[in-house]
Amino acid sequence: MDKLLIRGGRPLVGEVPISGAKNAALPELCAALLTADPVTLHNVPRLQDVATMLRLIRNMGVQVDRIANPDCSVADAAGIVRLDAGALSTPEAPYDLVKTMRASVLALGPLLARFGEATVSLPGGCAIGSRPVDQHIKGLQAMGAQIVVEHGYMIARLPQGCTRLRGARITTDMVTVTGTENLLMAATLAEGETVLENAAQEPEVADLAEMLIKMGARIEGHGTSRIRIQGVERLHGCEHAVVADRIEAGTFLCAVAATGGDALLRHGRADHLDAVIDKLRDAGVQVAPEEGGIRVRSPGAAQLKAQGFRTTEYPGFPTDMQAQFMALNVVAQGTATVAETIFENRFMHVNELLRLGAKIQTTDGRVAVIEGLGGAAPAGARLSGATVMATDLRASASLVIAGLVADGETLVDRIYHLDRGYDCMEAKLRGLGADIERIQ
């Protein structure tokens, strides 16, 4: 099993490319199921979840051609994927392909909308709380779908005599990104108008909507909490570039800040990271949009002030940045309180940070109080390298950030979590001067 060996203490300096967003690429791959015409996606990241999704749709009978440099030393090689679902023969997502990736549920809406039936295994792939799919099911039922859950599968079909879903006004009980995406895709081929209330406003949802519009969909209000979709009879193919990954960009912002570096994040979108950037600036980090990306300069963590925050839905502070910013707080000055409101069980990185010397106390798995090490000694206290174990995707990133500033060697085990969401992370960090390598 692969591990990352990190020798800390080097500032990150230079330029780093930000890849396409996993959370946009996955639904956009599923959007190709909505049409019989070819679809071409650019800037598709090289990630385990993307590879799993491609295997899933290929298993359905979709022709998939991928042009990507498999060499992770070429960290800026944007991937191109061409998909042709014209001969799709099996509208089914079996458990053996779905079990490692929750996003496979995104195939449900497109398959049902285009073929009138779909069989999708209940998803797996994430250890963070329950993340129920009931909002997907309720929304599709409101559009006329008949759905039963049995033997671990969601079996969906249109009522006898119906050839299309019907438009509906749908208000989800909670803000759900994948739920919004699934219902958005299904609604593009429904009869009449669909209104999604309490819709997710994330940039990845808006980017999916932009792709669907290129395919001929009629959508208004994406990027707001109310999305209107006027269904059409068919969609056509398109070319689309996946939006830059704001969470990868935020992760590198925290890594550069923690190490006292100076870097340009090429392709990064500052306007998608307002909540994170505001906290970094409050901490003492210089962050500014620059032509072609985001510039970040830091005096070093020991001179930064720890920042409290509360995770909320976009445009608030993203839950997917909680662990990385906590790692920065660990080595900054002062005390900060972090409240996690989106998912349960999302402090699993805390025990591993404690192994490196962090000072963190948690309450009920929802609130963490971090006593920064930056003010603990005249020269600033230090983390000390150790062997740590990744427990989920963003926890992995927080341990890497901590390892970059720790004294000595840090060994991060179970980095398959990292490979699910970061495109060639160690190659990009080496390009900024980090001493990091992948070992067996």
Curated annotation (Swiss-Prot):
Its main location: cytoplasm. Pathway: Cell wall biogenesis; peptidoglycan biosynthesis. GO terms for biological process: cell division; cell wall organization; peptidoglycan biosynthetic process; regulation of cell shape; UDP-N-acetylgalactosamine biosynthetic process. InterPro entries: Enolpyruvate_Tfrase_dom, Enolpyruvate_Tfrase_sf, MurA_subfamily, RNA3'P_cycl/enolpyr_Trfase_a/b, UDP_GlcNAc_COvinyl_MurA. It comes from the Bacteria. Cell wall formation. Adds enolpyruvyl to UDP-N-acetylglucosamine. Belongs to the EPSP synthase family. MurA subfamily. This is UDP-N-acetylglucosamine 1-carboxyvinyltransferase. It comes from Acidovorax ebreus (strain TPSY) (Diaphorobacter sp. (strain TPSY)).
